[in-house]
Amino acid sequence: MASTADGDVGETLGQMRGLWPGVEDLSLNKLATSLGASEQALRLIFSIFLGYPLALFYRHYLFYKDSYLIHLFHAFSGLSIAYFNFGHQFYHSLLCVVLQFLILRLMGRTITAVFTTLCFQMAYLLAGYYYTATGDYDIKWTMPHCVLTLKLIGLSIDYYDGGKDRNSLSSEQQKYAILGVPSLLEVAGFSYFYGAFLVGPQFSMNHYMKLVKGQLTDVPGKMPNSTIPALKRLSLGLVYLVGYTLLSPHITEDYLLTEDYDTRPFWFRCMYMLIWGKFVLYKYVTCWLVTEGVCILSGLGFNGFEENGTVKWDACANMKVWLFETTPRFTGTIASFNINTNAWVARYIFKRLKFLGNKELSQGLSLLFLALWHGLHSGYLICFQMEFLIVIVEKQATNLIRDSPALSSLASITALQPFYYLVQQTIHWLFMGYSMTAFCLFTWDKWLKVYRSIYFLGHVFFLSLLFTLPYVYKAMVPRKEKLKKRE
């Protein structure tokens, strides 16, 4: 799902929904006022788009230059962005980066270093959430720090894997394992890379080092032909930005808390939640598409070639836009949304819990980690609890339809496919909106008020299915189908 960083950026875009008039005084404060945004919001938006000229500078003046120059450029530009947005509070990220380097050097490739990193970085982030918490989204230093926290935890695990026997590692772990010893400058450049410092995406140290060495290009020895792919993602991001800016005054989460919403018919309350649930995610889509374009332009988005020779620029993709817009399944939305963060959790949390021997338990603990990483508000826990519940029920329903001859035949009727799709999408986005209500309102008094107004529909619906579908499965699936499945 979305992160705290994503929520802060989303609030930024929500604030920037004025008529965009021209201004004569270009001071940040007056410009922000004329745009209907806060100065802090304008600084953030400016910083995200600043990645494009920085990437162009890197391409034309630093590509294939000495590694230390590239690390210095990335570290200095990222620190400058941090200072520009958060003033002296940029020291929080700098402190964690330096201490992380010391942990790697002093503790080495040990499990102790991994646990120390996990405990320290998460504790620092959660303490930041606690001491800066308010009832609303604020643009503060914890926004990029949650992105940095995952980077540094992943760095420690990859460094630990680099000291293990290669044969004991999976192919994925071998790909990310760090064989060398990172210098402080390398860790700083990796941490402060301008295209991902504020809102992501996540990427590994090994991938970053390939960028520094000039290996992330479709034309060896030359700059990558990534300008057009980068502009395509930027253009798509701008389309979402314009759409969100125009519609955001009319579709707000604040309306969910109004008396007018409470007095509307039940069907209206559900339909508003459905539309809002789809629309609210567009603010995250916008930011990820824009930052993906920065990563592509610099070369970091290079991901090799297809079998037919087509270049892939999706190494830093956080969105699969077509899948996101068309999938009728909750798991489809999860697979298309915040891809790199989800991949990070799968790689470093979910798969590392394999020793538990229970996939559902591993999934539940992974989602609990995600909820805590987002923040200390109860709404995050409720949102990811709903995701866990919905995914289990969706899997039950899929198995039932697949294994039941009657339901399988009914589902395969071509003439009814549009109707099925409409029903699926309605259920899908209604309960995505239901889950996002807790995520976006995040304090218990707010999300509880909205859930009461629709009678806890999401919990009632999915908990009922969770307990009844196994009995329906027993009744509708012949014994031979069950035996075949076991085989």
Curated annotation (Swiss-Prot):
It is an enzyme of class 2 (transferase). A motif (Di-lysine motif) lies at residues 484-487. It is a multi-pass membrane protein. GO terms for cellular component: endoplasmic reticulum membrane; membrane. Pathway: Lipid metabolism; phospholipid metabolism. Its EC number is 2.3.1.-, 2.3.1.23, 2.3.1.n7, 2.3.1.n6. It comes from the Eukaryota. Belongs to the membrane-bound acyltransferase family. The di-lysine motif confers endoplasmic reticulum localization. This is Lysophospholipid acyltransferase 5. It comes from Rattus norvegicus (Rat). The gene is Lpcat3.
